[in-house]
């Protein structure tokens, strides 16, 4: 597998020639599109398999108590397939660090890296558990819309992200597209079963979105201020950082979710769940394995965009996939009155415009970098 490299620091960019910068930017764009594809593929597979699981498990037809069980299992599945990434981590090449700079960073650097991964592992386990519960209480669109608002706020205060008009337009289009065009989910209760003034539902709405948005911004901060500063990969951002972070964070989250699974006694229900599965135990196991692998595909794409661009951009792409996923769910399942009507068609158009706006902002930024370097080259040649 080819190594992916993030954008160069500004000082290093100025030492390059325009042709070299153009080549690096081309590689960067390819990396961005590959990570975006992984998010779209992961989102689609996760939602299709989740719907398949809840339909086959008869949860919507069962009593309310059983409908809200199994959330620790879902949280564990979201993180447990990280070992599949370990071979890719060792296959990927990485730049050799300077031994002197690494030795100077070793003592303090490793402690900072460990603290980062433990903190992120706790956050990921929290939002994995609460999202599994939250989507059973409130609509998928409300969850993700709240999530994007919080990610925007955290990006401004934690990552010091500078908003331009194209990014703001992208956020507005994304919020509208996701709120009106989110995919149907078989586990969501009917409107007559929900209470809009239920405090528990609102708390379950706020806490997972808060944990997810905070984790995205801390991941970006971790790449920029911790992993790069330790200089284990030189001064560059490389794709191996994504796999390292995903493996370590998922390991911590898996441990926490496993403890939760056994402490809650939920593990006792696994045998009954497999026996109730309409398609049988084989399809039950295959659906869980497929879900676990799909979550890893999604997570690698998400972390890749955090590394290459920002946590906010990763969230916009993740949410921009919702209308596409909604179309796939309509085609694959028959949920009462669920259809891809004018509202979702408008949401799909809004998602396209949202992504186009953000991509245009990135294109303008990259074009400006080349123009500045060309101007610098011309000034040097005249001197």
Curated annotation (Swiss-Prot):
Domain of life, per lineage: Eukaryota
Regions that span the bilayer: 30-50, 72-92, 113-133, 138-158, 166-186, 203-223, 247-267, 297-317, 322-342, 346-363
Membrane topology designation: Multi-pass membrane protein
Principal location class: membrane
UniProt GO MF annotations: purine nucleobase transmembrane transporter activity; purine nucleoside transmembrane transporter activity
GO biological process, one term: purine nucleobase transport
Localization in the cell: Membrane
Gene Ontology annotations for the cellular component aspect, listed alphabetically: membrane
KW Transmembrane helix (keyword) present: yes
Keywords: Membrane, Transmembrane, Transmembrane helix, Transport
Entry similarity comment: Belongs to the purine permeases (TC 2.A.7.14) family.
The protein's name: Probable purine permease 16
